[in-house]
Structures are given as C-alpha cells and as structure tokens.
C-alpha cells in the first residue's frame, strides 16, 4: 500500500446530510443530540445549496453539514424527492487537492466536476468524486498556513 494517502493528510471533516429545511433539521439535532450551529448558514450559488455546520463542541472530530436546496435546480432535490433526505456525502480535507484528485482517479474514482471555490470554506477549493463503490465524497483543500 502506498504512503501517498498519509502524505496527502486526508482528514474526515464532516458528514453531509440532505434536508428539506435547515431550520427543522437544526432543531431536531439540537433537541435530540445537543448539537448546535457552529458555522453558517451559507448560500452557495455555485453548488445551488444552503448549508449550516453543526457540532457538539468546537473540538469535535467531524461536524454535520446540513444541506438544503437553493433553487429549483439544486442537485439535492432529486435525493429529497426519492428518499426525503439523509446522508449525502463524506467530506475529507486534504493538504493537496490536485494531487488527491490524481490519486483518487488512479484508485478508480470518477471526478464529477473540476475544483471550484466554496462559500462555506472561505473560498477554498472543493471537488466531488464518486468512488468505485458509488459513494459520494467531497474533497476540500486545507487552509494555507504560509
């Protein structure tokens, strides 16, 4: 096994959950699990979604990203229509997004779109891939510390 994944610094950042309403889902997670909004909501017109990030505390290993549609042509509308929502994707941060994408393609993943800046990550680039087992992963470049 290659040591490249370790060099790329993959770290689980959040679990994305498709919801019809940020408000209702936020209230449910607050009352049921004690989660609270730690960032957002953000409207992201490029992704056609509105998102909020929730956690129990700032030190949580991974957050929950609630994803609601922004507009009628939002890509998550089909999931909401079929399943009513639920787990949508896993997001991993990486030290080198471009190298991570090359590595993912070498592992049989499919790149769904070229990297774009994301509002929720202060303009850091994100990319979407499907794994060979049909899992949707979001990759986000780590913050620059230069």
Residue ranges and their predicted role:
Residues 1-26, 85-92, 143-146:
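N-terminal beta-strand motif that seeds the catalytic metal site of vicinal oxygen chelate
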Residues 2-8, 19-26, 52-55, 64, 70-75, 82-146:
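Vicinal oxygen chelate
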Residues 12, 16-19, 29, 54, ...:
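Short, structured motif recognition centered on aromatic/hydrophobic residues
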Residues 31-43, 107-116:
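Short secondary-structure junctions
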Residues 35-59, 119-121, 130:
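N-terminal strand-loop-strand beta-hairpin
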Residues 47, 59-62, 72-73, 97:
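Short, charged/polar surface micro-motifs in flexible loops or helix N-caps
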Residues 49, 59-61, 82-87:
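Short connector loops at helix/strand junctions that flank enzyme active sites
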